């Protein structure tokens, strides 16, 4: 027979979603939500008023609920980790570039 634990994504296997479904799904949801917030802040966020920002994060939380169910067998959290790393590298290089240009001026 097919063993479900063999098909789990890395984070789902790490949080043992197959053995502890309640705690594992909450941990997976928290991981996906935190990573989605990081990717959103690094790549897409603009300065918004507090209420508009709250609405954005509510919809982000709702979207992460769907992503959590997909993230059990698909590499959703892993993709968010890669996206966050790429955006962090981009922001560091952008900061260094601006710092170098201001030093030349």
Curated annotation (Swiss-Prot):
The keyword ATP-binding does not apply. This is Uncharacterized membrane protein YlaH. It is found in: Cell membrane. The chain crosses the membrane at residues 25-45, 48-68, 69-89. Keywords: Cell membrane, Membrane, Transmembrane, Transmembrane helix. It comes from the Bacteria. The keyword Transmembrane helix applies. One of its GO terms (cellular component) is plasma membrane. It is a multi-pass membrane protein.
């Amino acid at each position: 027979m097919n063993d479900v634990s063999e098909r789990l994504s890395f984070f789902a296997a790490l949080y043992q979603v197959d053995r502890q479904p309640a705690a594992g799904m909450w941990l997976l949801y928290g991981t996906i939500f935190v990573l989605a917030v990081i990717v959103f802040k690094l790549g897409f966020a603009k300065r918004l008023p507090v209420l508009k920002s709250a609405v954005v994060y509510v919809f982000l939380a709702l979207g992460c609920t769907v992503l959590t169910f997909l993230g059990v067998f698909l590499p959703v959290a892993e993709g968010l980790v890669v996206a966050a790393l790429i955006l962090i590298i981009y922001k560091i290089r952008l900061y260094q570039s601006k710092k170098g240009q201001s030093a030349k001026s």
